[in-house]
Each structure stands twice: as C-alpha cells, then as structure tokens.
Amino acid sequence: MAVQFNEDKKIFRLDTKKSTYLMGLTPEGYLGHIYYGDRLYKAAENYMLRMEEPPYTPSVNKREKSSFLDSFPMEYPTGGIGDYRESCLNVRNEAGQMGCEIHYVSHEIYNGKKALKGLPASFGTEEEVQTLDILCEDEILRLQVVLSYSVFEKENVITRSVKLINKGDQKLKIEKIYSACLDMDNENFEMLTLHGSWARERHIQQGPLRYGKQMVSSTKGESSHQEHPFVALVTPGTTQQQGKVYGMHFVYSGNFIGQAELNQFDSVRTVMGINKEEFGWILKAGEEFQAPEVVMTYSHEGLGEMTRSYHDFYRNHMIRSKYLHNKRPILINNWEATYFDFNTDKLLDIAREAKSCGIEMLVMDDGWFGVRNSDNCSLGDWKVNTDKIIGGLKYLVDEVNKIGLEFGIWFEPEMISPNSDLYRAHPEWAIQIPGREATQSRQQYVLDLSRSEVLDYVYESVASILRSANIVYVKWDMNRQLSDLGSTYLGAEEQQELFHRYVLGVYALQERLVTEFPDLLLENCSGGGARFDPGMLYYSPQIWCSDDTDAIERLMIQEGTSMIYPLSTMGAHVSDCPNHTVGRVTPFETRGHVALAGTFGYELDVTKIPEEDRKMIPEQTKMYHKYHELVREGDYYRIASYRENHLYDCWAIAAKDKREVLVTYVHVFSTPNAHSRRIFLQGFDPEAVYVLEGTEEKYTGEMLMKCGFLVKGFWGDFKSKLYHFVKVTE
C-alpha cells in the first residue's frame, strides 16, 4: 500500500517507487514532519520529531509551548500561537483577533483521488493513486482543516492540498492559506527557481540558501513572466544525474508564493500557496474554502530524474485533452506575418502556400473583430469585422477547409477596451476603483470575472463564434496583468477576494469551453508565457511558451520550461528573420530543430519568405511527422546547457522502451582551432547496439553514455543537427 498508518507509533507513511514521506503525531495531537527522501523499507520511527529536546536551555524539556512550537517540524504550521517561522494558515475571528491552533482529529485512507471544487487538479484511477485525508481542528474557532495527500506511486509524486470548513457560528477571515509546507533539516541546500521577463521567461536560477527567507512570487493576477510557481531545494553539486532534489510546483494560475526559510536551528521550512498579499477570504458559518494543489517530487538521481517524474505525471494525471496522446496539427499563425494588416484574401493566400508546404492549419490571430486595426480598441466586441473578413467568418473557414487546412482563431476574452461598445454599455464590468483613474496596459482594462453576468457574456461571445463555423483550435490570450483591484459587485469585506475569484472565473470559463467543445485544441497564452503553469495545462494541452521565437533565445527559455513541463506542452514556432524580438538572423534549419522540441508550427508569411527557406518547410514538416510521437511521449534528457557553457546546447529524447533516441545539438558559437566535441549522451539501453541513422556507424548504448559521442563538422554560428540513433534488432 502506498499509504499506511502505524497506530502504535502514530506515524503516517507515504511510499512512491523511489521515495518515502513520514509524518508523526505528538501526544498533544500536533502533526509533525519526520522524513522525506529515499525509499525506506523497514519500520519507521519518530525520533526525528525531537520531542524531548529543549530548544533554549540544556535542562529537561518541560514542553513549554512557545519554545516547542518555534522549533518543532510542523507539517502544517498556523499563525499566532508561538511558532514564529512562516505559517501556512492565518485566521482572524469575528472579534478581529488572529490565532489558530490545529490538532489531529482523525484520518481516512482511500483509493483514488477526489476532484477539487472549482480548481484544476491532478486525477487518477483507484489503481493509480491512493489518498490520505487528515482531519485537524481548532476547537476554539471550530475550524476544521483537511490536509490531503495523494500518492502517485509510479510517477514518484505526492500532491497536497488543504480544505477549510467553518463548523462554528462566527464568521472567520482567512488572511493566509498556503497549500503545502516541507520542514526539514538543512543539508546546505541551494534554491533552484525559474525567473525571467517578457520574451525571456523561465530562465534557471540557482543559489545557496541564506539565513532568513528567500522567495519567488507574483502579485500580478497571473503566474507571471518574472517568476514561476516552482521551487526546488538541491544539495550542493547536484547535476542532471546525481544529487538530491526536492521539487514543489503549484497548480494555480494567479498570485502565488514559494518560499524557503532557513532558521536559527538550521532547519528549512519551504512553503507554497496563494500569495497572502491582497488576499483575504470571508468564511461564513457552514462554508468551505478549497486551496489549490501542490505537486511534490523527490529525486536522488539529480535534476534529470525530477524532470522525467514531472513530465510523466503531467502527461498522465493533469492534461485531459484528447490531443494528449494524438498528433497535433502543424499550424501557421498569421500574427508575425501580418499583425493587424490582413483580410480574407491575404489569409487565403497564406493558406494556399502553407498547404503546398505540408502545413495543416491556419490560425487567424488578433484583428478580426470589432474595428480592431490596432491594439487601441474593440476588446469585448466579439463580432466579426466584415470589412476585413469579407464574406464573413464561415465563408473564410469554409474556403480554408476547401484548400485542405483546418482553422483556428485567437481570442482575448478576459479583457475590455475603453474604446469598445462593451465598455460604453457596461463600464462597471471593468476591474477598477471608483473615483480613481484606472491604469491601462496595452490600452485595455480587465473584466471583473467575479461577476456571473460577465462570465456568461464572455462565454457566449466565444462559444457563439465557435458554433458559427468549423473552428477546431483556439488561442486564448491575456495581454496584461491585474491592477486597480476594485469590484462594484463585491462588498467591502469581499474586495480582497477579487484576485482569487478572478482566477476561479478563468477556470470556470475554460471548463465550460472544453465541456461544450471536447474536440477543441485549446492553447493558452499570456503575452507569451506569463501564464504557463500546471493550472492552465488542466484545460489546454499546450501553452504558448514565449513571444520570443528566436531560436537562440528559445534555448534557455525551453531549457527552463522543459525542466518541469513535457515538450508537448510548449508552444514553439519557426519564425521569420531577422527575428522580430531581437533582430537576430539564424539558419532556417536551426529554427526548425529548436521548434521541434515543442509543439512545432510556423509564425511567418510563407508567401514572402526567401525561396530557399520556403523549400525547407516540406522537409521540416516531414521531420515533425517522423518524430512527433517520440517528442510527445519520450523521456527527456538534458545533455548540455548553453546557459552554462555559453557555446552549445544539447538534449536527447529517448523512447520509453529505449528503441530509439533523438539527439539535438545546437552549435551556438564557433571557436578557432577546436577539436571535435565529446558529449556524454543519456537515455540509451547500455546493453544494446544502436545505428546512427543515415550512416553505417554503430555504437553500444554503454559507449555513448560512458565514453561519449563526437560532434563535428560545424562551420559558423547558430548551426544545429539532429542525430537519430535506432536500436539494432538482430
């Protein structure tokens, strides 16, 4: 069994195939963290709770409450009672006093996993996952706290979430609720996070823990370009293949915090959840509040094992789309080809040329609705602009279908332009503070998705367009963050609920969309990758990775993203050069190889690109058809990092049964008088013999991984090559 409880020792035990997680109860009913790490096979003990140690004096510990709580490895710490480290739960009573102390009441172990109401969350059958629900309670507040742990044994993952139930008569204010805490002794941990900006999202950052608190967070109403809801603690010297890694990833698309605190006793408390800044929730008598989920994994074989655990987990237990295990169509998006300057004839010209190159879908981006010829108007007015889309949307879609392409369309449903019919009719639908001039970003406001009538309007606006024509793909965009937090719908006490209610509104809209249109391929986007998070994956199998499509910039963006997300989730396109973001010119072949490590598509005007580039597209589309299953389903191995060596990049994708391995090598910069470069590959069966496709060269898997492989023959910068190794069957 993945979950066990030792009644005599009062120890909970959670086992995955490679890890064990232990919790124990004190005589007073406090739930403490004992261990998380390599799989244990013998009986567990609770001595790591240090229940008899005095934290301040060398005398016998009299269990003085304040000193005990400030050093005890609390499984779910609460605020206001003497634990002065970061708490996970702060509750204020009706009299305005803040304090909460929870004790164990009971627990339940069952096969399967319950859905989280209104939230994206992992799922699994009764054979795939086992869940432990621990019921704790503050008897004074009459507040129940349900700590849920779901063990996905095969994927080496434990998920955690928290639910609050107000069983009393008074109204409570939740001022902070985090979803997970990991309280451990320090092992000279370093903190690994993902940081960035618009057009350079999710770059890897790593550094030693210092005393005090270190965190990543967002207060923008989205997971953001700048920080990512992911934290890993790693031991010094951790590489792709060795070292301890503790990963925590938040399944949420709004404000978050991930924080590690190194304290006076050299213990580390790592917490993750909804950011407490500008958060508050009124919990009335009889009401419940469900916090989002955190996905945890432990690896003792470096970052590579963590990566593959997350990849398998998200593929098997987070993404619901029918496209999860099916080939995605090769699309061409007209944004960088035309921006707002297009009409029916131009789109059909692109479609005809795209079809001749082997492309399978045309996506019409921003500018098809209202009077939208720039970004200064019409968001919210989701009516087709027949001056541009001559003959109407159905005519355009039908004509594209006749050419032999499928059709997709762009929306930004959460936004409203001040210069729009919708805003003139309903200014109160925009998030803003009455009497204060609201801040515009990209000349737009954000709709108040806490209002049911707004949700209904937005949904029907999108759904009616999809019902009107044969549209099989939607790109759902969000191009600004939230500010001026005010809702004319919510009362004064509820204003701090707006950030979270907004995110719940987004989830409700996308849930309705994928329910009515189950065959729809939905791709989320937010100014590129500002809302690339597990919450969005629950609704869309792919997310636009970044607005930066430059092949070299994408190396670090896709390296960081692929550390936790499957390659099939990363929207990646071949675009024109000079690149529209950085002005760099790279070979068309390299752009294709980098985009192959994602969803693979095109973002250019295929009617205008150089003929030598256009001639390469049919070969690139054949390349995608050949390798799409391997890229989508295979095991990912990071071989070398351009971020670290500043010269080259390399990764490998191995079939689950090791029958084939695809290696991508990107030669970023040349150096004079250089030998061939030896790279140590991964992902092979050490006992098998492989042939390098296109040659007669044969290698054992053991040689490729231990002795290495020589790459050579590169002249000039920004070049790349694929190496396809196939297992010899005789």
Q: Where on the chain are the PLM-derived regions?
A:
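Short Pro-Gly-centered flexible turn/kink motifs
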Residues: 97-106, 281-300, 719-726
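Aromatic-lined carbohydrate-binding/catalytic grooves of carbohydrate-active enzymes
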Residues: 323-460, 473
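Active-site neighborhood of glycoside hydrolase catalytic domains
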Residues: 390-392, 424-426, 430-587, 599, ...
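Conserved, mostly hydrophobic/aromatic
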Residues: 18, 162, 286, 332, ...
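C-terminal beta-strand-rich structural cap/linker in extracellular carbohydrate-active enzymes
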Residues: 700-730
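Carbohydrate-binding surface patches
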Residues: 231, 642-685
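Polysaccharide-binding surfaces and accessory modules of carbohydrate-active proteins
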Residues: 5, 10-13, 31-261, 277-279, ...
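Glycine-rich, aromatic-flanked loop segments that form ligand/cofactor-binding clefts
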Residues: 70-73, 78-110, 116, 242-255, ...
